[in-house]
Amino acid sequence: MATRGHVQDPNDRRLRPIYDYLDNGNNKMAIQQADKLLKKHKDLHCAKVLKAIGLQRTGKQEEAFTLAQEVAALEPTDDNSLQALTILYREMHRPELVTKLYEAAVKKVPNSEEYHSHLFMAYARVGEYKKMQQAGMALYKIVPKNPYYFWSVMSLIMQSISAQDENLSKTMFLPLAERMVEKMVKEDKIEAEAEVELYYMILERLGKYQEALDVIRGKLGEKLTSEIQSRENKCMAMYKKLSRWPECNALSRRLLLKNSDDWQFYLTYFDSVFRLIEEAWSPPAEGEHSLEGEVHYSAEKAVKFIEDRITEESKSSRHLRGPHLAKLELIRRLRSQGCNDEYKLGDPEELMFQYFKKFGDKPCCFTDLKVFVDLLPATQCTKFINQLLGVVPLSTPTEDKLALPADIRALQQHLCVVQLTRLLGLYHTMDKNQKLSVVRELMLRYQHGLEFGKTCLKTELQFSDYYCLLAVHALIDVWRETGDETTVWQALTLLEEGLTHSPSNAQFKLLLVRIYCMLGAFEPVVDLYSSLDAKHIQHDTIGYLLTRYAESLGQYAAASQSCNFALRFFHSNQKDTSEYIIQAYKYGAFEKIPEFIAFRNRLNNSLHFAQVRTERMLLDLLLEANISTSLAESIKSMNLRPEEDDIPWEDLRDNRDLNVFFSWDPKDRDVSEEHKKLSLEEETLWLRIRSLTLRLISGLPSLNHPVEPKNSEKTAENGVSSRIDILRLLLQQLEATLETGKRFIEKDIQYPFLGPVPTRMGGFFNSGCSQCQISSFYLVNDIYELDTSGLEDTMEIQERIENSFKSLLDQLKDVFSKCKGDLLEVKDGNLKTHPTLLENLVFFVETISVILWVSSYCESVLRPYKLNLQKKKKKKKETSIIMPPVFTSFQDYVTGLQTLISNVVDHIKGLETHLIALKLEELILEDTSLSPEERKFSKTVQGKVQSSYLHSLLEMGELLKKRLETTKKLKI
C-alpha cells in the first residue's frame, strides 16, 4: 500500500490500521479490522475492498472477487476505493477491470484530470491503443498540456506498430500522427526534447528520411540535448538511410577529430570511404565537399587520416587505443579490397606487438587483439607469441621454479600472452602429456597470482583467475579427446578450489554447473545456479543451463522448483513491461515504448518459456496424476485441452546466450552460427515431441465420457472434431515429428563443449522410450475402437490389443535392460561415471507413468464389458458364454507390469547399496600425486556426485513405488 501523509478525512484515519496490517503482511488481522469497521460503517466501500485484498492474499480469490465486484458495481469515485480496487485487480492479474472502473469514474466526474490520467494508464496496461488515443485527446481538452497531446500522438504510433496491415499503418495512423505534430510545429508549441524525438520517430517510420534530417538539422534539433551527440547520431543514421556517403564521411571525420577514441565513428568512416571509392565519387569543382564539410574519398586520404590520429595520440599524455586499432581495421579492409601493399601501413604482426607493449597490462588488450589475429599468417603464430613473451617482465627461471611476474601489471601481460596462445591454436596441437604439463604450469601461476589478491574483497575476482579457467579448458580438451575421466574430476577440483578464492566468479560457477550436469549430478547445481544471482532477462538467456537437466536427472523436487523459478520471471514480465510503458509515457521517453513492446513479445515468444511451461506440466502430471489426484483432475486444474496448442511455433524466439562461457578457442573450434542454427532446430523438435505428448495425455480422460454411436455424423460443439479424431491427429503429428527427430539424431552433431547443450532427444530414442510411448498411444486408439464397436465381431481388434499388451511389456523390459549397470564405479584405480544409465532410468519412470495412464483408460473400457458378460452369465445360468481372451491378456499384462516395476525398484535399491558402499576416500588417499589441498577438494567433488546420485535414485524409487501401488489398483 502507498504510505499516506498527514490525513484530514476521518475515513482515512479509520482505514489506517487496515493499510498497516496489509503493508506488514498481516492479512488475517486486516480482514478482521475491515469487518469491524464495516459493522459500524456499512457504506465505507474502501474497507470492503481492503478486506478483498486481504482475502486475495490468503488464497480466497473467489470471495475477494465477489466483494470487489459489489463495490465496482456502485461505480465509486472516491480516491481510496479506486486505488484499492486498482491494486486488487492488479494482484488478480485482471488489468482490464481497472479500465471499466475509471471509465465509470470519468463519466461521473468528467473534468477530473487525475481520473482521465488514470484511465489513460489503465488502457496502456492492456494495450488498448485506440482508446488511449481518445483518452489522451480528452485529457488535452480538459487540461491543454503538451504531454497529454503527445500521449495521443504516441498512441497513434502504437496503433501503427500493432496493425496487422502495414499499408494501413503507412496510409492512416502514421500520416495522422504526422499531421498532429505538424500542427503543433506550425503553432510553435513544441516545448520538449521528447516531442522532437516523437516527430523524428514518425518521419523515420514513414520513410521520410530527408524531412527527418531537416528536423534534426533545423531549429527543433537544438532541443536534443539530453544525450551526448544525440543530434549527430540521428543525422548519421539518416545519411546512411539516404546513402549520402560524403556527408557520412565528413561527419564521422569531424567527430573523430573531436574524439579519436570513438570506435563506432571509425567504422562509419571506413564504410563511407570504401563506398565513395566504389562509386568513384569526386568533390564538386567549387564550394564545400558536402553539407558536413571536407570528405575523404580515397584510400590514401584514409591512410593519412589514421596516421595523423596516431601521431596526435603519441603526443598526448593519455594513451588512446582507438587510433591503433583503427590502423589494424584499415589493413583488414584494404586486404579485402586486395590493395594492402600499395599503402605501406606496416606489418600487422609488428603493429600488434607494439600495441601489446603499450596496452598489454590492460585486461582489454586480449579482447582488442582477438578481433585481428586472423591477420597473422599461421606460420608466424609461435614466433609472435615468443616475441610477446620476450617483453613480459618475469623473474629468471630456475630448474625448479617458473619465470613468474613480480607485480600485477606483469601478471596481466603474461595472462594476455597465455590467452593469445590458446586463441592461436598452439595448445590444441599438443598431445595429452604436453597439455597436462601446461595445466600444471597454469595452476602454479594461478597459485602464485593469489599473492597479489590477498586484499581483494569477496565480491572481487582474483587477478589470476583466468589461469585457473585456462587450465580447466585444457583439461576439458583432454577429456573430450581421450575420454579420460580423471581429467574431468581434476577440472571440478580446480574449479571448486578457485571458487573458495573467488566466490563471485560467475565463469567458475557456470563451468561447474555444466560439468556436474554432464556427469549426471543435479544436486550441487541448484545452489551454484542460485548463487549466480541471475537478474531479470538472464532467467531466459542462461536459464537453459539449469532447466535442460532439471527433470532429466531424476531430482523431481528440485526440477519443479527450477521450473517455477523460471516461470515466475516470465509471468511477471507481462505486468512489469506494462509498468515500464506507463513510466515511459509519464516521462516522455517515447522512443523506448516500441522497444518495451518488442521486449515483451520477445519474452512471450521465448523458446525457453515454452519449454519450461511444457516440462513443468509434464512434471506435475508425473508427480501428482493418479497419486494424489486423478489424471482428469490434474488436467482440469492445469486448463489443458488437447485441441489447443498455445506455443507460437512461427514466432518462437531463441533468446539463449550461447556465448555465456568465456572461450579462448580458435574460430574453427568455437561456437559457430551453424551450431546455433542446428541447436535451435533440435530444441524445437524436442519441444514439439514434448508438447504433443502432453496434449495426447491430456486427451485421455475425455475418452472416458459417453462415446458417440458408430458412424455418427454428430461432431463436438463449435464444429470441433470428436475427441478421438483430435487424438488421432495428434498421434499422426507425433509420429511424423519422431521420424524427423530420428533423422536429426542420425546426423550425430557434436557441439563444442562451451556451446549449445544437446537436448534429451537422443536419449529418448536410444533408450527405446519413444517407441514405447507411441505404442501405448496406438493402444488407446484400438481400445477406443473396441469401445465403440463392442466385443462382438471385433476379433481382429482384440487380437491387436492382446499383441499390444505383450509388445509393450517386451519394450519396457528392453528399456529396463538399458538402465542396468552401476552409476559410479572404480576402474583401474579411477572413478568412472555412467550418467546415461541415470537418464535412461528417468525416461523409464516417465514412460511407465504414461503407460499406466493408458492402462487406466483400458481398464475403464474393459471393466464394464466384463461386468456385463458376468451378469449375462448369471442371468442365463449358462456356461457357454466364453470370456474373450482380451480380459485375460489385460490381467497378464498388469501382472507383468507389477513384476517389472518391482524389479526396477529392487534394481534401484541395489544401486543405492553399491553407491553407499563405495569407499571414495580410499581412492583419494591412494593418489599420491595430490597435494593436501587437492585431496580436500577431490573429496568434496566426488562426495557431491555420489550424494546427488543417491538423491536421484531415492526420488525415482519413491515415485516408482507409488506407481506400483497404482498398478495394483488396475483390476477388471
Swiss-Prot record:
TPR repeats lie at residues 11-44, 45-78, 79-112, 114-146. GO terms for cellular component: cytoplasm; cytosol; Golgi apparatus; NatB complex. Non-catalytic subunit of the NatB complex which catalyzes acetylation of the N-terminal methionine residues of peptides beginning with Met-Asp, Met-Glu, Met-Asn and Met-Gln. May play a role in normal cell-cycle progression. It is found in: Cytoplasm. One of its GO terms (molecular function) is acetyltransferase activator activity. The keyword Metal-binding does not apply. It holds the Pfam family NatB_MDM20. Belongs to the MDM20/NAA25 family. Transmembrane segments: none annotated. This is N-alpha-acetyltransferase 25, NatB auxiliary subunit. Component of the N-terminal acetyltransferase B (NatB) complex which is composed of NAA20 and NAA25.
